[in-house]
Design a protein with these regions (language model features):
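Active-site-adjacent loop/helix segments that line or gate small-molecule/cofactor pockets in enzymes
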Residues: 1-25, 39-45, 60, 74, ...
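Conserved PLP-enzyme active-site core in the AAT-like
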Residues: 7, 69, 73, 83, ...
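Short Gly/Ser/Thr- and Asp/Glu-enriched loop/turn motifs at secondary-structure junctions
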Residues: 21-22, 204-213, 238-243
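Acidic surface patches and DE-rich sequence motifs
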Residues: 28
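Glycine-rich loop-to-alpha-helix module at the N-terminal edge of alpha/beta enzyme cores
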Residues: 35-106
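PLP-dependent enzyme catalytic core of the Aspartate aminotransferase-like
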Residues: 87, 228-268
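Active-site C-terminal subdomain of aminotransferase-like
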Residues: 124-220
């Protein structure tokens, strides 16, 4: 059983099905509201539903643009990526993370960066030759955009390759572009003031770097910790090496059960 299957089964056993999701919350069949720190490994970093990308997806879908035929949205996706990285780019869409990385290594062997909002390491995105962007859309777990800096050196490298983009429907393409603009706005507006308010409870169990939560709990006790959190109505990342995310905009009181019932995490 995979980690995600384990998490889903644990939620269903305790609370029934998830009937609605909004912001950082999951609303369950048994009437319990869960605070989601996992958010599909960050693909729903801005929360569930209610985003501009979701509205854009519905609007384009209503126009019947669900095929892989040419539309104006390919150009909009390129423009969104160029705005995100503040540089002229050529983009290639892959449906597999490793395929995107393998292509990037051939183009520029000295290093490829995966774009991550609020990344704390000092990366100058505008000058990075190859950047892989995963749009922050929870319904597109298989879209990876390789953004290659548009210069003569990379143009020569690309000339020797037969790279082609995976065709995606206009509705998804439009949503991807809008999701990138959504995250650009969020990066500009959200900062430490939105994250530290949860430290009183969370930093006992996680090291917080920006909005990301890296476990302090010993790896051998992490599964037990995840179940304990679920009993306190908190959903954590099912993967030890995939960070959680603070629940933007939620009242710190959502962690009151975890505060009243702390997890004992001494090593076995």
């Amino acid at each position: 059983m995979s980690e995600v299957d384990f998490l889903n089964d644990a939620i269903a056993e305790r609370f029934g099905f998830v009937r609605r999701a909004r912001g950082p919350f999951l609303y369950t069949q048994k009437g319990v509201r869960l605070t989601d720190l996992y958010r599909d490994a960050g693909r729903a970093v801005l929360g569930w539903g209610g985003t501009g990308a979701f509205t854009m997806f519905k609007n384009v879908l209503s126009r019947g643009l669900t095929g892989s035929f040419p539309t104006c949205f390919s150009g909009r996706l390129l423009k969104a990526v160029e705005t995100l990285l503040d540089s002229k780019r050529k983009i290639f869409v892959f449906n597999d993370r490793q395929k995107a990385l393998s292509a990037a290594v051939v183009i520029f062997s000295e290093g490829t960066f995966f774009w991550k909002p609020w990344r704390t390491e000092g990366v100058v995105w505008s000058s990075a030759d190859c950047v892989i962007v995963e749009p922050p859309l929870a319904w597109t777990p298989g879209i990876f955009i390789l953004a290659v800096l548009d210069n003569e050196k990379n143009e020569a490298a690309l000339a020797g390759l037969a790279l082609s983009s995976v065709r995606i429907s206009a509705a998804v393409e439009a949503a991807c572009a809008r999701s990138i603009y959504d995250i650009i706005l969020a990066v500009q507006s959200k900062s430490e003031k939105d994250w530290f308010i949860y430290d009183t409870v969370l930093t006992k169990y996680w090291e917080r770097r920006g909005p990301y939560l890296y476990p302090k709990v010993p790896k051998e006790k992490y599964c037990e910790f995840a179940e304990h959190c679920l009993d306190c109505a908190v959903v954590v990342s099912p993967f030890y090496d995939v960070p959680g995310i603070v629940p933007f905009g939620a009242d710190p009181g959502v962690f009151s059960a975890l505060k009243k019932k702390p997890f004992v995490m001494e090593k076995i």
